[in-house]
Amino acid sequence: MLKTLLFIGMGSFTGGVLRYLISRYVQNFLTPSFPLGTLLVNVLGCFAIGLFYGLFERGNLMNPNLRMFLTVGFCGGFTTFSTFMNENFQLIKDDNFFYLSLYVGLSLFVGFIMLYLGYSLVKQ
């Protein structure tokens, strides 16, 4: 268990640092008025987690610690949006459109409400 946690931690560190560097570079040098850096990181994270899970299903990358490093660690540190999208993709693959709609709707609606509540709490 400790070894797995270390792999996740190393992946999270790597993904988080890379997210910061990419996002900062894009925002500073390309377009400071639109959150293009975050959008780029989220889209790249979705591509990465799709690539990794595709390789897992083919039988490649079967080492459990490497899987944890890449998915929970790297992709989780890079962007949680990739995990969110992968979970939605799994619901689509399972033909579970009710839970897909519920998950997307609640994530966006409740997430925005909670952001607003948190902001309002300290803004007063």
Curated annotation (Swiss-Prot):
Pfam families in the record: CRCB
Membrane disposition: Multi-pass membrane protein
Keywords: Cell inner membrane, Cell membrane, Ion channel, Ion transport, Membrane, Metal-binding, Sodium, Transmembrane, Transmembrane helix, Transport
Example GO molecular function: fluoride transmembrane transporter activity
Reactions catalysed: fluoride(in) = fluoride(out)
Residues binding Na(+), per UniProt: 76, 79
Alphabetical GO biological process terms: cellular detoxification of fluoride; fluoride transmembrane transport
Activity modulation comment: Na(+) is not transported, but it plays an essential structural role and its presence is essential for fluoride channel function.
Transmembrane segments: 2-22, 36-56, 69-89, 97-117
Gene Ontology CC terms: plasma membrane
Subcellular location: Cell inner membrane
Family in the record: Belongs to the fluoride channel Fluc/FEX (TC 1.A.43) family.
Its biological purpose: Fluoride-specific ion channel. Important for reducing fluoride concentration in the cell, thus reducing its toxicity.
HAMAP family to which the protein is assigned, alphabetical: FluC
Protein name: Fluoride-specific ion channel FluC
Gene designation: fluC
